[in-house]
Every structure is written in C-alpha cells, then in structure tokens.
A protein has these predicted regions:
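Phosphate-group recognition and catalysis centered on beta-loop-alpha active-site segments
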Residues: 17-302
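Bacterial Sec-dependent N-terminal signal peptides
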Residues: 1-27
Length: 302
C-alpha cells in the first residue's frame, strides 16, 4: 500500500511540471531491448567497432555507446574522459603511467592524436573472455557507417543505437567534455548524415542534455539513466517522463515496472551480466536489459 501511495505522489508531481505530451515509441523499435553494453564488453574491447559488430552478430538489437566531443569538435566513442590505463596502451604498446593518464583528456585533444591509442591489446583481467586486438577509439559516424555496412553484408537486422552522453556538472568544471547542448547538437548533426532514420536514442545520467533534447529535438527518443533509489526525486529532477527509464538493475521491482508501463515508459535496467538475474528481471516485467554479454539472450531463450 505504501508503495502505491508513493507512486501516486510521483505521478502527480511530474504531471504538474510536464507539458501534455503523450509518450509513444517508434513502431520499428523492438518489443524487447537486447542491448549490448559498449558493444560486447565481455567479449571484445569496449566501445570499438569490432565490439559493435560482435554485438549484432550474437543477437543484440540495440547497441550502447558513450560519447565525448574532441577539441576539433568530433563525436568520439569512449566511456572515460581520458585513457583508462586498465585497457589502454600507447600506440607502440608501452604502458601509460597512472600519473600521466589525465594529460590526455579527449576533449582537449584532436582526434588525429586520440586515435593512436590502443584500447584493445592489453589483457583486461575483469573481462577474461575478451578477445585481444589492436584497435583505436572510433568516431560516432564511423562506427554507425561500419555497423550499417556489416549488418547489410551479413543480412542481419539493423540495430537501434543507444547514444549515452557523458556530461555532468563535475565534468563541466574539469573541462572533460563540452557543454551538454553542444554535445547534443554535434551528435544530432552526425546522425543526420547517416541513413538510420529514427534508429537511435539519446540517454544520460545528466538531466540537462535530456531536457535540451526534449525541447529542441522533440521527435528523438530519450533514455534516463539513474542510480538513485528515490523515484520521486529522479522524475522531478528530469521534469518529465522519458521514453525509456534505465535504473541500476538491483533497484528494479515489479511495482516499478507496472508504474513505468502505466506512464508508457519502457523499463530497461543496466548492467546485468548474470543469466539468472536476467530471468528474474524479465519475470518482473522489464522491457529490455543492458548487458556486457548480449550472447546471453539466446542462451536464456530471449
């Protein structure tokens, strides 16, 4: 009973600050989102073109990428704002000292220099199944073009691209990324030049770019990432109900799924790397799962 009351309060609070706009998903979006996190991080170097190709090969219908702007205003695929020394080497194969990593902030570098880093050769103990290949960080447009060519050549279904904007107030102060609106506009310009139509959505933990997308690009699907347990606070911070709500998976309950569905939101939690937990979430009513192992979907019959 207490949970029902809380969810009713949330609905009232958000309705009060949300313009009347009925949520609807494009008809070509999947009934269930089988999302490859950073491609297939469990099997291939994260956020690389080979990782994305592997994801669609093993059955992902949606691939998630993280983006930053570079100094020369290009949309870079990377989870971290500078080299992650756990899996990044200099081009000659030498190690990057921990003290030196922050000398190479992507937003303060041109892409010609960024692409020289090797993000795929170094053994990564956290991901023992990950194939090791020498590969660099791609640009968003390059990645989309490569994946589209790959699925066409191999007669695979065309995926949805989940583009996560790595912005935050903290990153603003550290100059780790461009201002949110600038990142959004750059992503939209890149996507416009590709023949993918509406097969992408924009997500972030940062409410600012999502609010900007809703205002300037109302046709774009929005995903809201959260770690917060308080649904009331989460939705009031955003100011509207997104198309896709993506909480940390341990926060998901059947009541949350029911509430999301009552507001026409899709519930797609992150990041689930255990098959039994996947089954439990599906039983609770989630509309998709973000995982480092999209090959698991076939193994659980999804």
């Amino acid at each position: 009973m207490k949970r029902i009351v809380v969810l009713s309060v949330i609905a009232g609070c958000v309705a009060a600050c949300t313009a009347s706009r009925k949520l609807s998903m494009p008809e070509n979006y999947p009934a269930f989102y089988k999302e490859g996190h950073r491609g297939t991080r469990g099997l291939m170097p994260e956020n690389t073109i080979p990782s994305m190709k592997k994801a669609v090969e093993v059955g992902a219908n949606c691939i998630e990428v993280d983006v930053y702007l570079t100094k020369d205003k290009k949309v870079l695929i990377s989870h971290d704002p500078f080299p992650n020394i756990a899996h990044t080497l200099y081009n000659d194969g030498s190690e990057i000292a921990k003290a030196d990593a922050k000398k190479y902030v992507w937003y303060q570098m041109n892409y010609e220099d960024i692409k020289k880093f090797d993000v795929g050769s170094k053994p990564f103990p956290a991901w023992p199944q990950q194939q090791k290949i020498k590969v660099g960080l791609p640009l968003l447009g390059e990645l989309i073009d490569s994946v589209e060519a790959y699925v066409t050549a191999n007669k695979l279904p065309k995926p949805i691209y989940n583009i996560e904007l790595k912005t935050s107030i903290r990153f603003d102060s550290l100059k780790y990324n461009a201002p949110p609106a600038e990142v959004v506009d750059a992503v939209m310009e890149d996507v416009k030049g590709r023949n993918i139509g509406n097969r992408f959505y924009i997500q972030s933990f940062d409410v600012r770019p999502l609010q900007y997308v809703r205002k300037k690009y109302p046709q774009v699907v929005i995903g809201y990432l959260t770690t917060g347990k308080n649904l009331d606070s989460n939705f009031k911070s955003l100011g509207f109900y997104p198309h896709i709500y993506s909480p940390e998976f341990n926060l998901v309950t059947k009541a949350m799924a029911d509430f999301c569905h009552s507001k026409n939101m899709k519930l797609v939690p992150w990041t689930v790397n255990d098959k039994e937990k996947m089954k439990r979430l599906i039983a609770d009513g989630v509309d998709g799962i973000i995982t480092d192992y999209p090959n698991y979907f076939a193994e659980i019959g999804k």
